[in-house]
Swiss-Prot record:
InterPro entries: DNA_helicase_Holl-junc_RuvA_I, Hlx-hairpin-Hlx_DNA-bd_motif, NA-bd_OB-fold, RuvA, RuvA_2-like, RuvA_C, RuvA_C_sf. This is Holliday junction branch migration complex subunit RuvA. HAMAP family: DNA_HJ_migration_RuvA. One of its GO terms (molecular function) is four-way junction DNA binding. The lineage of its organism: Bacteria, Pseudomonadati, Pseudomonadota, Gammaproteobacteria, Moraxellales.
Amino acid sequence: MIGCLIGEVFALEAPTVLLNVNGVGYEIDTPLSTFCQLQKGQHVTLWTHLVVREDAQQLYGFIDAQEKLIFRTLLKVNGVGPKMALGILSTLSIELFIHTIEHDDINTLIKVPGVGRKTAERLMIELRDRFKALSVQATTGSTVTSAQIQFSSNSPIAEAEAALQSLGYKPIEAQKAIAAVKADYTEAADLIRAALKSMMK
């Protein structure tokens, strides 16, 4: 099992990071909370989780070990796969997610793409005790930071829309959300953060 990878960020295309580890490039899918803290050329440690299927192997990476723990805990919930788990961690900060579970705040949880009421109720039931058993502690701060990141050659608006679509939002939803905030921000990371906040209201 690959527990973590230490290397240099070679390329970024939301939500995937190409990490150069001693000359070998690893494609790693990340939540936007991690993705938006990375810069091309940055030396970084990513805590990883490997999912092996019959047709593929996929690495998922996190800049914070606690986020990896939450991701693995989410995968144990019936009906929750890696894509939904990444969507939850991309949309909600760890602090807000834990608060949502502890206070049975279904209305917040169903705003995450792909999470319906039944899934939200199942998450509430299965995670409440697991969080207590794991002694998970909340962290402060927004899910998506305003760190300066180097995306590909696409415009910040296009990159922000693509990032939202990678979470499961429909193209029209992503376009409307970005259009509503693009007058106030020029960086892709800021656009993503502002759009997610507006959609969670």
